[in-house]
Amino acid sequence: MARIAGVDLPRNKRIEIALTYIYGIGLSRSKEILKKTNIDADIRCQNLNDQQIVSIREILESSYQIEGDLKRFESMSIKRLMEISTYRGRRHRLGLPLRGQRTRTNARTRRGGKKTVAGKKKAPRK
């Protein structure tokens, strides 16, 4: 089993797809990496030799931010937005949608489950 960037790649999948298991690598970036290393995209992960694995690893380390580095960069960006109190930072802090979506309805993913508020009660008759 090939282990690249701390991720065990699935043995029986094509290398083009297996690379997408690494955080920060999608299908287009996977194809780009394979083109740089001159590895056929149809090779199964279990059929890679050590030299091919090393070449993929070298390109990933030199050219791309992946896994922990990328996650750290994203969290630092969000913290920076919150510290300088931008609109997006305040929305992150409140746990609300950031990009202009409506919140009166349909914001359940960011806001969590429904919290029922009691309705207005009628005054008792005399």
Swiss-Prot record:
Protein name from the UniProt record = Small ribosomal subunit protein uS13c
State the protein's purpose: Located at the top of the head of the 30S subunit, it contacts several helices of the 16S rRNA.
**What gene codes for this chain?**
rps13
User: What's a single GO MF annotation on this record?
Assistant: structural constituent of ribosome
The subunit structure is: Part of the 30S ribosomal subunit.
Q: Which family does it belong to?
A: Belongs to the universal ribosomal protein uS13 family.
Instruction: Tell me the compartments it is located in.
Output: Plastid, Chloroplast
Report the InterPro entries cross-referenced here: Rbsml_uS13_C, Ribosomal_uS13, Ribosomal_uS13-like_H2TH, Ribosomal_uS13_bac-type, Ribosomal_uS13_CS
Question: Tell me, what is an example of a GO biological process annotation in this record?
Answer: translation
Question: Which Gene Ontology terms of cellular component type are present?
Answer: chloroplast; cytosol; small ribosomal subunit
Pfam families (UniProt xref): Ribosomal_S13 (PF00416)
Disordered: annotated segments:
97-126
Against Gene3D superfamilies, the record matches this protein to:
1.10.8.50, 30s ribosomal protein s13, domain 2 (4.10.910.10)
User: Basic residues: which segments have biased composition?
Assistant: 101-126
Q: Which UniProt keywords apply?
A: Chloroplast, Plastid, Ribonucleoprotein, Ribosomal protein, RNA-binding, rRNA-binding
